[in-house]
């Protein structure tokens, strides 16, 4: 394999929010991004628990689903949230995703955050989480509508969505940990990691992100919405993030013949998810 070399920003034609190869410190931009991730969790709580989400839906002429009974967990701080078990689990998934991003930024990531990247990625998460929960509250689109099974923990959309979410989030963490361990070894400096899941898929972390995002969408807005989110991120990664990363890696070090394995695996996952939901939910 050829030796790794530095790649100047001017050499890269693809657009990406991550300044590849720039490992300088960016405390202000990093703090801004993490602040937006924390704010996202509070916004989702307001949407799920108070009149914020209901007001938005009614403003646009929609109707909302009935609020399920508050969960009785035996823990005062949880019960004070006033959320049903379904809504509490949706909020929990949002918080877990944000916690994963905190962990990644503070312990794994090496590239500096740009101001644009911090704002765009932070607002992107707020947008999709807000869209999820507004569609959950809207009677016409909710995965918890009476037709879909109601706002109960036994709702098949919630159960299936949570499993998919957990698989995707854990897989993404495993990918990042494996790659981090590989990079910490001085003998691997400048080498691309091709072990673990990276030996099967060129970009397993992008695939895993798509998986957990689609699981969260499924639990909020049902199967059609969940599949739409999966297809959107497959398109976004295939046309933006993957070409940008591949270009950087190709210019930095010989990577071997390029393939589209990650995209194919994402499509395979989409088909598997569709079959799984059809089996347990019984409707599209």
Curated annotation (Swiss-Prot):
Disulfide bonds: none annotated. GO terms for cellular component: membrane. Its main location: membrane. The keyword NADP does not apply. It is a multi-pass membrane protein. Pathway: Secondary metabolite biosynthesis. Keywords: Glycoprotein, Membrane, Methyltransferase, S-adenosyl-L-methionine, Transferase, Transmembrane, Transmembrane helix. GO terms for biological process: methylation. Pfam families: DUF1295 (PF06966). GO terms for molecular function: methyltransferase activity. Probable O-methyltransferase; part of the gene cluster that mediates the biosynthesis of ustilaginoidins, dimeric gamma-naphthopyrones isolated from different fungal species. The first step in the biosynthesis of ustilaginoidins is the production of gamma-naphthopyrone precursor YWA1 by the non-reducing polyketide synthase ustP, via condensation of one acetyl-CoA starter unit with 6 malonyl-CoA units. YWA1 is then probably substrate of the ustZ to yield norrubrofusarin via a dehydration reaction. This is Probable O-methyltransferase ustE. It comes from Ustilaginoidea virens.
């Amino acid at each position: 394999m050829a030796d790794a070399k530095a790649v100047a920003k001017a050499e890269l034609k693809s657009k990406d929010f991550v300044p590849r190869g720039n490992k300088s410190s960016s405390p202000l931009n990093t703090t801004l991004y993490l602040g937006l991730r924390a704010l996202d969790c509070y916004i989702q709580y307001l949407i799920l628990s108070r009149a914020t989400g209901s007001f938005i839906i009614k403003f646009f002429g929609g109707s909302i689903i009935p609020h399920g009974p508050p969960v009785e967990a035996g823990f005062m701080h949880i019960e004070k949230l006033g959320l049903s078990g379904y809504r509490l689990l949706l909020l929990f998934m949002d918080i877990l995703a944000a916690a994963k991003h905190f962990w990644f930024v503070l312990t794994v990531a090496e590239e500096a955050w740009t101001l644009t990247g911090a704002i765009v990625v932070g607002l992107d998460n707020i947008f999709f989480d807000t869209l999820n929960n507004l569609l959950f509250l809207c009677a016409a689109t909710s995965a918890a509508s009476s037709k879909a099974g109601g706002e109960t923990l036994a709702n098949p959309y919630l159960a299936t969505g949570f499993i998919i979410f957990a698989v995707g989030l854990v897989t993404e963490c495993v990918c990042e940990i494996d790659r981090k361990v590989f990079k910490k070894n001085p003998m691997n400096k400048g080498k691309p990691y091709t072990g673990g899941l990276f030996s099967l898929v060129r970009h397993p972390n992008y695939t895993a992100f798509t998986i957990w995002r689609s699981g969260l969408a499924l639990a909020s807005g049902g199967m059609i919405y969940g599949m739409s989110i999966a297809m959107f991120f497959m398109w976004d990664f295939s046309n933006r993030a993957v070409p940008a990363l591949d270009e950087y890696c190709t210019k930095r070090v010989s990577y071997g013949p390029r393939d589209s394995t990650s995209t194919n695996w994402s499509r395979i996952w989409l088909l598997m998810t569709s079959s799984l939901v059809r089996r347990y939910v019984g409707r599209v």
